[in-house]
Amino acid sequence: MQKHLDSILIKPAGPDCNMNCTYCFYLKKLKLFPEKKVHRMTEEILDKVIRQLLAQTLRELSFSWQGGEPTLMGLPFFQKAVDLQQKYGRAQVVGNGLQTNGLLIDKKWAEFLNTYKFLIGLSLDGPEHVHDKYRYLRNGKGSWSKVENSAKLMLDSGVAVNALSVVNDYSVRFPEEIYEYFKAIGLEYMQFIPCLETSSEDPSKSASFSVSADPYGIFLCRLFDLWLGDFKEGKPTTSIRFFDSVFYLYAGLPPPECTLLEECGNYVIVEFNGDVYSCDFFVEDLWRLGSVPSGNLIEMLNSKRQKSFGEKKKALVQDCTECSWLSLCRGGCTKDRFQYTKDTKLNHLCSAYKMFFQHADSRFKKLASDWKNEQAREYQARQQERLEESSRSAKKIGRNDPCSCGSGTKYKKCCGR
């Protein structure tokens, strides 16, 4: 069965960025494009990407704009993108997400983002001492004050903003401080991304700034208790993407987070030059699927190479296949399997996930049970309302009126007999 491409990740400025963060894995991607110092997507490639995606018979589609730093393209580029979406759209619901470091966001940007309802992922690790540990400007100074000001500007302008916080060897110590900081400045939607980069000396080991498994497990447990403690009337008041995704699994729904899926390969990445890859973490020659100028995105999504990439996630070690948490973890993200176990690879964060699921399991089960019961009650209430409405309608029908069942005969000779 052919897959549909309902979401796509576009990197219009490639790996280019106006910051110099210590832990950035995108900097390595500069080696893929040695022929240019500045990388910018042309209007022709932009047109083809949007036209191909919107040619599908799907009701909802989403565009995710990332980098590097996508705002380096300038506001006119994104206005053009919206214009093309409106030009090629066929009454679909089109969503746009923009991941940014926030440095270039000003009033005009904020007004544009609010007007077209962009969902923003803002790279902000936490309060000043956390954020400025590794996130530097090009001059070597910290970027926190500029990024926080951008957050406040966008929130004041009505823009939906998610905090994207990289959990590293330092920030992992401060879950309470980071969580409360985000709430205090109005960032109630949060995504915590474990920093896992391999050492340049030994690829089987993690880099010094990467988060270790056990501290990350403790971080997740403490964060979960904070999240749960803020519930009101049985419902969350803050959103943490990983917890939301795990809840989906307990509720029997597909999770939004791809790391928890059984198989990868449900979307593709388009680089600035139109090259298409299997995943943002695998922008390398082995997983290059083709090129937008000469190919079709839907065909690339359904190609043998993309299928092979997706099935890589299913290749699990015995420790995983025999684990009681497999139905929740699914081995985690493929890129994080660099901790060797026997002759294959185990996810570097395996012990962290085990710690977290053991800590949260009973409470997730209760949350899922309460949600299902609420859904059942709402369904029964809707059914009862329909029955009552039907009964009221029936009482209004005269004996000589057409029967409401649609038979075409009089009520007295049909349902009114």
Q: What spans do the regions from the language model cover?
A:
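Cysteine-centered iron-sulfur cluster-binding motifs in ferredoxin-type domains/subunits
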Residues: 12-20, 69-72, 264, 320-322, ...
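N-terminal [4Fe-4S]-dependent radical SAM core
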Residues: 1-11, 56, 380-394
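Extended hydrophobic secondary-structure segments that form protein cores and membrane-embedded regions
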Residues: 8-10, 62-68, 95-100, 240-243
